[in-house]
Amino acid sequence: MRYKVSENLSDRNGVVTNLHCFLMRSLDTGFKTKWSGLWSPPYKYLDYYGIRINGIWLDSDSVQAVEYGDQMTLHHDVGGIRVKENIAAPSDTPGIEVTLELESKNKEKKAAHVMLEAGVDIRHKSQDISHEDYNIETGPNRVRLARGRKNLMITSEEELNLKGDPYQREHFPGEKQECIVPGKIFFKKELENAETINFRFTTSEGSFGSIEKRNQNFEHDKLDRLFKYSITSVKNLIYDKEGIGINAGHPWFQSYWARDTFWTLMGLIDAGYFELSEDILTNFAKRENIPGKINLEGENRTEYSGESDTSPLYLIAADKLERHFRINDQIQDGIQKAKHNLEIDQKGVALHSPEGTWMDTLNRERAVEIQSLWLEATERQNMDEKGELEKGLNLFKHEDYIKDSLRGDDIATINPAIPLMYGQIQEEDARKYLEKINAEFSSRYGARTVSMLEPDYSSSGYHTGSSWGLTTAWS
């Protein structure tokens, strides 16, 4: 699905992706932060590109509207020339393709002198500035820039006329960045009818797979749009870098976080993406344990194991896939690994790292959602510990709400929505707790993380009041 916007473009960002890379930019044409540009996680390749036609830049003054979806199309008006700037990330391309459609507004023959400036910045995401030198090679219709073992190719089907010497440029998209401009690249077109110019930015390695296609339609128009936008958003985060996986978020969370992945799989399975879900669960299962995160580069790619909800979420997601489709032997092995990670105290409470919950900025021992997820997992997997965990969950129940954790200084959070969602609370109590959620957690943007009546509540607090899509879906 695509939609068209023409207002507040400077406040909106767009992302175009395939299984290999993503390009992020502002819809007003800008590359405004160090996270903008072309990335093949976890490496950056391009800080920005700029286009000038007959001496006029395609920028916030020229752009009239933007169509946004699986591609990004910017509509410009430049000195009597209509320009459509289309940015796509084809599945068979380890990079992006930019196509300019040029048309004279008065239908008279007109020359279009087009200049492309590219700010190349090949570096790891952990670096702001790399001091390695570039090697630049030119050939017919191409420019290749290499730094270390990574390279970026600028190619075109048109005659690519490179002029001027390469130069280093400092710029400040929020923070100081350095890039190299290989020279100015020129194209020329005589406009009698509509003409096109295309060029590509491609990296040194690629993933050329594609995601299975599904088509679902809702009779309710708004729900139909919401569902399709949600699926598109998830697909934008899928990569084939260290096996198939889902990055936690653009632009900076460039790893496969288990928690984010398994929650997302619940929706993907419901939407019918069975083979994709199987591949992702298999990718986690074939590791030594079920890791809390898979990094896309480095020697210790699964070193982080701090997610306390990784194992129960894996068990729940695997069960859901099995009921809807199938699971393979590797996923079965993953299920056994996950089961062994359950630890319970004498009161039937699940033990876990205080820093390992989704609210990882808070120290939360014996958290209610971990208890609830393990209870749901034991029921799905017919584990003997189910009865103990049911008794343990009763310790969280309070007269007017469910405790967030069993700490003495407990606060009212949205996390009790999880046992409510899984039907683990008796109906009479559930109604009472839902009334509190509706009164204290509901906002125009969704479900708050913390009750607005808490002394430390902050509407912009990461885990202390802001509304999340995750918490809203639970509620």
Where are these regions (language model features)?
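Aromatic (Trp/Tyr) and acidic
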Residues: 6-37, 364, 368-372, 376, ...
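Aromatic/His-enriched, Gly/Pro-containing loop or helix-boundary segments
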Residues: 84-87, 290-311, 317-324
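Extended glycan-interaction surfaces of carbohydrate-active proteins
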Residues: 71, 217-256, 279-304, 340-365, ...
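Terminal accessory carbohydrate-recognition/targeting modules of carbohydrate-active enzymes
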Residues: 1-222, 259, 270-274
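Short, solvent-exposed loop/turn segments at the edges of secondary structure
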Residues: 17, 93-95, 259, 307-310, ...
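Well-ordered alpha-helical scaffold segments within catalytic/enzyme domains
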Residues: 262-274, 312-327, 372-384, 418-428, ...
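A generic secondary-structure signal for well-formed alpha-helical elements
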Residues: 106, 120-122, 205-207, 272-275, ...
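Generic recognition of stable, solvent-exposed alpha-helical segments in well-folded globular domains
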Residues: 225, 229, 259, 263, ...
